[in-house]
């Protein structure tokens, strides 16, 4: 009874964390994808969008993909719970790790590109862009924070998936001995 309650609470915790990661990743993708700002620079109207910096566009697509992945895993968690065999557990572990790495890598790459926009690159004669597009830069910073929180949550989920994989091996190799089969003579 206690073991069943642990499994149910573990499934609920995983579902809650998957829902939170999906919400964070979706919020990061939406905030980043919908951010634009138009400013006049030297009598020329210039519109700053996420497509101006390729790393930001990649982050928006990766965050949207991560949100979709977490929603699919949330559905799996709700309908299957911890059910499934070793193959499903390994598949979930590998996909969770790939999602964590991709989310983290794209967020860090976008943050690095944003540092150039924030400080400029004097050797290349690139000016500071955040002085011009202040609101856009603030929205991008918010999406970077949300993306990093989603990456950390995905890393925690990856650890839970690893625990689930090793639980399959531990339970099968340390299960109590099976009772002897009953025969007709025993009755």
UniProtKB/Swiss-Prot annotation:
The keyword Membrane applies. One of its GO terms (cellular component) is plasma membrane. InterPro entries: CASP/CASPL, CASP_dom. Residues 36-54, 119-139 are extracellular. Disulfide bonds: none annotated. Residues 1-14, 76-97, 161-187 are cytoplasmic. This is CASP-like protein 2C1. The lineage of its organism: Eukaryota, Viridiplantae, Streptophyta, Embryophyta, Tracheophyta.
